[in-house]
Design a protein with these regions (language model features):
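Phosphate-binding and adjacent anionic-ligand microenvironments
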Residues: 21-23, 41-237, 244-246, 255-261, ...
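Short acidic/histidine-rich active-site segments
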Residues: 2-4, 103
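A generic beta-sheet turn/junction motif
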Residues: 6, 240-242
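Hydrophobic, small-residue-rich alpha-helical packing segments that form membrane-like cores
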Residues: 4, 11-35, 40, 44, ...
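Short glycine-rich anion-binding loops that position phosphate/pyrophosphate groups of nucleotides
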Residues: 5-9, 107-109
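Active-site beta-strand/loop architecture of penicillin-binding DD-peptidases
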Residues: 250
Length: 278
């Protein structure tokens, strides 16, 4: 089952397994399905360029990193917003260095090809139908393909918690939450060690073990990001369109049930963190 929003730039997907049960795919899941299919097919049919890149936003699943590693392609992270993926494509074209392979974000947007500089659900729909037909020749459903990806790359699960804080007081509270975390970065989150703390407003990445500080290499933005042990992560940013502060997070499990449990534990920790700051 496929559905787009009214301007056809985001694609929602529900897939059926061999038992007739339907599964809703998150934007991370459908994006990874398409990334793996598009890059994998190109690799099989004509090979991949030495300077090819998969592009994702910083709040998008780390499974994308695993896909890039598997196919030995480059990976570029950009700030939230598909325009930043479009800017990378323009940069490839103007510099004559680098080739765009695929780009996506967790909020159900991706771009196949370079005909546009924004997410495109029309071409994504076509590609996903093509992928479904391809997997059917292997007696597989799209859900089977997703499970195969979990087995190959790891059982990644990503989620988000949002807190709505309206009005001038709410805006001040959102800033207070971010500044509190900025001044007091956690050493551990839900049992995961904080390996690096990224502050995109200060343009710094601090190694929490060595204290070494480097640049993010991205435009400044009021965003905090924590690289955690075991390929987990947490990102905090204010919404650009609503009076909300958003806590994005991701974990990697050893099975679907393990991933569910670890994600739920992370969610509880995030809520506890919010309550403590509030």
């Amino acid at each position: 089952v496929l559905a787009t929003d009214p301007d056809a730039d985001r694609l929602g997907v529900r897939v059926k397994d061999k038992n007739g049960e339907y599964h809703d795919l998150t934007g991370n899941m459908s994006g990874c399905l398409l990334a793996d299919y598009e890059i994998g097919q190109r690799n099989a049919l004509r090979g991949l360029p030495e300077d090819g890149y998969l592009i994702k936003t910083i709040v998008t699943t780390n499974m994308a990193d695993a896909i890039a590693d598997y196919y030995n392609t480059g990976l570029i992270e950009v700030l939230t917003g598909f325009k930043y993926i479009g800017q990378q494509i323009l940069g490839f074209e103007t510099s004559k260095k680098g080739e765009y392979l695929f780009g996506f974000e967790e909020s159900y947007g991706c771009l196949i090809g370079t005909h546009a500089r924004d997410k495109d659900a029309i071409v994504a729909t076509m590609a996903l139908c093509e992928a479904a037909a391809y997997y059917k020749t292997k007696d597989m459903t799209l859900w089977d393909a997703m499970i195969e990806m979990y087995e190959r790359y790891g059982y990644y699960k990503d989620d988000i918690q949002s807190i709505t804080l309206k009005g001038i007081e709410g805006l001040a509270k959102i800033q207070e939450i971010l500044e509190t975390l900025r001044k007091n970065p956690p050493a551990e989150i839900a049992g995961y060690k904080v390996l690096k703390a990224r502050d995109y407003k200060a343009d710094t990445i601090q190694d929490m073990q060595t204290g070494e500080v480097s640049s993010t290499g991205l435009p400044t933005s009021n965003v905090l990001y924590y690289d955690l042990s075991d390929d987990a992560w947490l990102c905090v940013r204010p919404s650009g369109t609503e009076p909300k502060v958003k806590f994005y997070y991701g974990i990697k499990g050893t099975s679907l049930s393990d991933a569910d449990e670890k994600s739920a534990a992370m969610g509880r920790e995030v809520l506890a963190m919010i309550d403590k700051i509030m």
